[in-house]
A protein has these predicted regions:
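Conserved N-terminal catalytic core of the sugar/cofactor nucleotidyltransferase
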Residues: 1, 20-110, 117-124, 130-131
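Single conserved hydrophobic/aromatic residue that forms the stacking wall/gate
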Residues: 2-9, 13
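Generic preference for hydrophobic
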Residues: 12-15, 69, 173
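Alpha-helix/helix-capping structural signal
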Residues: 48, 148, 214-215
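Short beta-strand segments
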Residues: 68-70, 110-112, 139-146
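Conserved core of the sugar-phosphate nucleotidyltransferase
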Residues: 119-209
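Conserved nucleotide-sugar donor-binding
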Residues: 209-219
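A C-terminal functional module that forms or caps the active site or interfaces directly
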Residues: 221-242
C-alpha cells in the first residue's frame, strides 16, 4: 500500500492550534493525504515523547488512517561508526527514512510535520507514485512551490532553492536558511543580513515534500556510510538530506 510518512514530528503536538477546534497543521496534512489516496502514516518521533504524542496526535489519526511509529535515534547508524561526542542534532531527512525502513512496504511520500502543503500537492505526488513503476530509472519526485508563495511577513524561512531543466527535472537543490521579504521582493542572506541576494518570485523552491519508490531505501543504505565518512571528518554538525 502507498505509505505516507511525517518527518520531525517530535514536538509538533505542542504547537498552537490553527483553528477553533484545536487542530494543528499536521491534522490538515493528514486529512489532505487521506483525500488524495494515502492509506498509512508513519510518524518519526523521539522515544521520550511517545506517550504524549500518541495521546495528542496519534489517537486522533487512527480513526482515519493506518498509523505506525518509528524512532529517529542518532545512535542508529551503520556498524563501525560512532556519534561525535556532544552531538544531539538528528542526522537529517534521509536518516529519518532510514529509521522507518521496516514500515515502508510501497511507494511513499516524505513531508515535514509543521509545514502546510495543500491538498493539491498530495494529489500530485500520489498520482505520480500511482502511475510510475519502481525501476532503475529512479522514479522519484518533488513537489515544488513558487518562492513568493512560501515566505512570510513574520521573519524568515529556510527553503531549498531548486535548479530544474526544460523538462521539469530536478538538477539540484541548494538550501538557503534565511530567506525573507526584502526591498519589495524576496532575498536571502548568508552573513546575518550584511549582504542580500535577490531571488525571482517565481523561483521553484522545495518545502521538503518528496515522493519515492522503495528503491530509494537501498540508495540510502548504500549512501549513508559514505556520507558519514566524508561528513564526520569535515563537520560534526552535518545532516543527510534527501
Amino acid at each position: 500500500s502507498t505509505l505516507m510518512r511525517s518527518s520531525a514530528a517530535s514536538d509538533v503536538y505542542k504547537r498552537q492550534p490553527v483553528d477553533n477546534d484545536g487542530h494543528i497543521i499536521m491534522d490538515f496534512s493528514m486529512y489532505d493525504a487521506k483525500r488524495a489516496g494515502f492509506e498509512k502514516v508513519v510518524f518519526i518521533i523521539k522515544h521520550e515523547i511517545e506517550e504524549e504524542f500518541k495521546e495528542h496526535v496519534g489517537k486522533r489519526m487512527e480513526k482515519y488512517m493506518d498509523v505506525a511509529y518509528a524512532y529517529q535515534n542518532i545512535d542508529n547508524i551503520p556498524e563501525g561508526y560512532e556519534v561525535p561526542e556532544g552531538r544531539v542534532k538528528p542526522w537529517g531527512t534521509a536518516h529519518a527514512v532510514y529509521s522507518c525502513m521496516d514500515e515502508i512496504d510501497g511507494p511513499f511520500a516524505v513531508i515535514n510535520a509543521d509545514d502546510y502543503y495543500g491538498v493539491e500537492a498530495f494529489k500530485l505526488i500520489y498520482d505520480y507514485l500511482s502511475t510510475h513503476a519502481d525501476d532503475d530509472k529512479y522514479r522519484y519526485t518533488m513537489v515544488g512551490y513558487h518562492l513568493a508563495n512560501t515566505v512570510t511577513d513574520n521573519g524568515y524561512v529556510s527553503r531549498g532553492v531548486c535548479e530544474t531543466n526544460e523538462n521539469g527535472e530536478l538538477i539540484s537543490v541548494t538550501e538557503r536558511t534565511r530567506i525573507e521579504k526584502y526591498n519589495g521582493g524576496v532575498a536571502y542572506t548568508e552573513d546575518d543580513g550584511n549582504t542580500w541576494v535577490q531571488v525571482p518570485d517565481d523561483t521553484t523552491v522545495s518545502m521538503n515534500m518528496w515522493g519515492f519508490t522503495k528503491s530509494i531505501l537501498e540508495e540510502i543504505k548504500a549512501g549513508f556510510p559514505a556520507f558519514l565518512d566524508k561528513g564526520l571528518q569535515e563537520n560534526a554538525s552535518i545532516s543527510c538530506q534527501l
